[in-house]
């Protein structure tokens, strides 16, 4: 579910080549943690793994990838990805 990011915008701001830090703890929105980046609002559909640091959103570089849905990847933990959704 959710909205889609137009491909030209996605290519400019998202993907492996565009890591970023969320900087603030994701706030609850509609029962899910939400963060903002690149002019878009995202909810974390999956929980983040327990082994991620308590301050991962401040300390870790992450990026958004599309693979039949949007996923948040953490460069410090390359084996894990979190399903996310674009919301307004």
Which stretches of residues belong to each language-model region?
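Low-complexity segments
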Residues: 1-88
């Amino acid at each position: 579910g959710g909205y889609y990011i137009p491909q030209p915008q996605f290519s400019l701001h998202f993907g492996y080549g565009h890591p970023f830090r969320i900087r603030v703890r994701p706030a609850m929105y509609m029962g899910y943690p939400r963060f903002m980046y690149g002019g878009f609002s995202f909810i974390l559909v999956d929980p983040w793994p327990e082994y991620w640091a308590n301050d991962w959103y401040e300390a870790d570089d992450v990026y958004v990838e599309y693979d039949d849905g949007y996923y948040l990847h953490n460069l410090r933990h390359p084996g894990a990805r979190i399903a996310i959704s674009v919301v307004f």
